[in-house]
C-alpha cells in the first residue's frame, strides 16, 4: 500500500521531523544514514 491513507503513510507521518538511524547503516527515506 503506497497510498497516503495506508499504514505506510501513517508510519511516515509519525517519523516526520524526527528521522531515525537506519538499522543496517544504509540510506532510506524513513531514516538517516548512520554508521560507516
Curated annotation (Swiss-Prot):
GO molecular function, one term: toxin activity
Gene Ontology terms: cellular component: extracellular region
Keyword flag Membrane: no
Keywords: Disulfide bond, Neurotoxin, Secreted, Toxin
Lineage: Eukaryota, Metazoa, Spiralia, Lophotrochozoa, Mollusca
Organism, scientific name: Conus pennaceus
Signal sequence, start to end: none
Name by which UniProt lists this protein: Conotoxin PnMLKMF-01
Tissue expression summary: Expressed by the venom duct.
SS bond partners: 21-33, 22-31, 27-34
Description of its domains: The cysteine framework is III (CC-C-C-CC).
Propeptide segments, given as residue ranges: 1-16
Homology family: Belongs to the conotoxin M superfamily.
Source species, domain of life: Eukaryota
Record localization: Secreted
